[in-house]
């Protein structure tokens, strides 16, 4: 785990993108809170907050620094891939060390919600978020939208004359043997969304058959869902299966990356944040203030400064220039609840029959 403490010296499409005792573990705890996102709000007496996040450190540094400037609250952000973040919360169930989870796909939050690891809290800022992106049970809070895509290294495709992939089956081309990089769903929320997308598109039997074939072309499974875009932009691999914001970020930075959305349909994530159940009492108020800030237009417009290329969930937040509208992407009807409820089972099958089998071969 990497820990960064933000000290006193010194977050897309508009209209889309923790603790109490004495209750049952699977019964989320509703809380009332009416913190106003206004200047002059009195800083709580305890000015510290601990957060777990799978987002890149460069992003969380900016978000947490801006939050401290606005509120006077210092954030200690611990970086973990989504799967490892889940495992960490399980280990700390009786004594959580963090109060807020920042980022990662909502299907992961659904799994955590069902495991009784999250505290129910809904920011008042959600009045500006489309209902379709909100948690029906009122536990996690949506903050951005991201679609799955192929990040393609244009230099490699120009050099080899290989056609760029336009659909999922194109990734099975022999010309791409060893040239695909993706994360393992055991640790990465990005890769689990890929897995759940293929299962929902094709059915389980055909999805597993496809993934067995795809495995023959995968040169590397990474720990983090962000890393494949980094590997592709540096020319180590030809194609990365990533969320669009990670690919667009590299392209807008001038790297030889072209973003291809599968023409036969693709899944997406609703990026979320939430309170950790049974989190340190002294951080409870600060945690709610942070959730309110993250879901506000002020918080989500920090995506522009961070060059994260994330699509804000808050309809009043401005999105970065140059990002294609979601209506240009063929999205499947992605079932978040199903994905969350089946997460453990699908990851276990992938790990046993594809990833581990590969490592042992």
Regions found by a protein language model. Name each.
Residues 1-48, 359-361:
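Short, low-complexity disordered leader/linker segments with a strong preference
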Residues 22, 29-111:
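Early extracytoplasmic/lumenal segment of secretory-pathway proteins
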Residues 50-61, 96-236:
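Extracytoplasmic ligand-binding site segments that recognize negatively charged/polar headgroups
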Residues 107-111, 233, 238-256:
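A ligand-binding cleft/hinge motif common to bilobed small-molecule-binding domains
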Residues 146, 210-215, 221-222, 253-277:
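Periplasmic-binding protein-like
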Residues 151-156, 196, 270-283, 302-305:
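A bilobed periplasmic-binding-protein/Venus flytrap-type ligand-binding module shared by bacterial periplasmic
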Residues 276-334:
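Mature extracytoplasmic/periplasmic domains
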Residues 332-361:
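Conserved C-terminal helix/tail region of periplasmic/extracytoplasmic solute-binding proteins
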């Amino acid at each position: 785990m990497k820990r960064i403490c933000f000290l006193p010296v010194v977050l897309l499409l508009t209209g889309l993108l923790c603790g109490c005792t004495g209750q049952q573990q699977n019964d989320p705890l509703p809380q009332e809170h009416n913190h106003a996102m206004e200047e002059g709000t009195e800083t709580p007496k305890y000015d510290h907050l601990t957060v777990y996040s799978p987002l890149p450190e460069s992003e969380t540094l900016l978000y947490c620094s801006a939050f401290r400037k606005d509120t006077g609250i210092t954030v200690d952000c611990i970086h973990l891939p989504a799967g490892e973040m889940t495992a960490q919360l399980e280990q700390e169930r009786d004594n959580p060390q963090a109060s807020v989870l920042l980022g990662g796909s909502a299907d992961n939050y659904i799994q955590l919600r069902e495991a009784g690891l999250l505290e129910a809290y809904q920011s008042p800022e959600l009045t500006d978020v489309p209902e379709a992106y909100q948690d029906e049970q009122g536990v996690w809070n949506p903050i951005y939208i991201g679609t799955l895509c192929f990040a393609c290294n244009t230099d490699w495709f120009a050099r080899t004359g290989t056609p760029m992939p336009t659909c999922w089956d194109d990734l099975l081309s022999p010309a791409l043997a060893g040239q695909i990089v993706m994360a393992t769903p055991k640790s990465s929320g990005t890769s689990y969304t890929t897995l759940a997308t293929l299962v929902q598109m094709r059915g389980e039997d055909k999805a597993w058959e496809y993934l067995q074939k795809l495995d023959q072309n995968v040169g590397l499974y990474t720990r983090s869902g962000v890393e494949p875009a980094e590997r592709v932009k540096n020319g180590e691999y030809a194609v990365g299966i990533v969320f669009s914001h990670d690919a667009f970020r590299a392209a807008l930075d001038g790297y030889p990356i072209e973003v291809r959305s599968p023409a036969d349909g693709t899944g997406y994530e609703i990026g979320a944040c939430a309170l950790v159940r049974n989190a340190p009492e002294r951080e409870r108020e600060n945690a709610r203030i942070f959730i309110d800030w993250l879901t506000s237009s002020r918080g989500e417009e920090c995506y522009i400064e961070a060059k994260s290329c994330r699509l804000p969930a808050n309809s009043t937040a401005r999105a970065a220039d140059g990002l294609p509208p979601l209506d240009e992407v063929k999205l499947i009807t992605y079932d978040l609840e199903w994905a969350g409820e089946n997460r453990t089972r699908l990851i276990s099958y992938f790990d046993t029959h594809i990833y581990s089998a590969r490592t042992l071969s």
